[in-house]
Amino acid sequence: SGHSVGCNIKLPFEQSPNPYTQTSITFSYFFIRKVLLVKYSYAFIIMPGGFGTQDEFFETLTLAQTKVINDFPIVVMGKEYYEPFHQWIDQMIAAGTIGQEDKKFMLFTDSVDEAMEHISKYVRKNYTVKPRKRLWWLFEKV
């Protein structure tokens, strides 16, 4: 298990830090929070939530679709909760407003093991130490 950092937003109602995080950072502005969430995350796990959750979900999907962020796994937990959204995605594909390949950005599941395997596969692929090819040998170009 890793260190969990929560990014909270200061609102006049409802928000309090997640009790399951080791560190909590509170932001005054949504846009700063969203930028830092994406910048310092290896993946997103989307849980059932309200407008703020959906806003972050759509922003991240858009960044992945437009290749602003690459190979960023988005795990959607709560298959039943998100089934209408899943159907809406299929309607957008049928209407031609998004491509079939845009579905690859999301994994819909209820399984913690499946979610962790999906994220682990991505991390192993994208965050490994790779040997660097030597560019110089005795100061000569190769």
Outline where the language-model segments fall.
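Phosphate/pyrophosphate-binding betaalpha-module
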Residues: 1-47, 51-54
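General structural feature for long, well-ordered alpha-helical segments within catalytic domains
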Residues: 33, 53-56, 81, 115
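Glycine- and other small-residue-rich loops at beta-strand/loop junctions that grip anionic moieties
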Residues: 26, 49, 77-78, 107
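Short, glycine-/small-residue-rich phosphate/pyrophosphate-handling segment
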Residues: 28, 81-110
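Short, acidic/small-residue loops that bind anionic groups at enzyme active sites
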Residues: 3-14, 47, 61-87, 100-101
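Short, solvent-exposed amphipathic alpha-helical segments in soluble enzyme
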Residues: 59-65, 90-94, 123-124
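SAM-dependent methyltransferases
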Residues: 105-106, 110-142
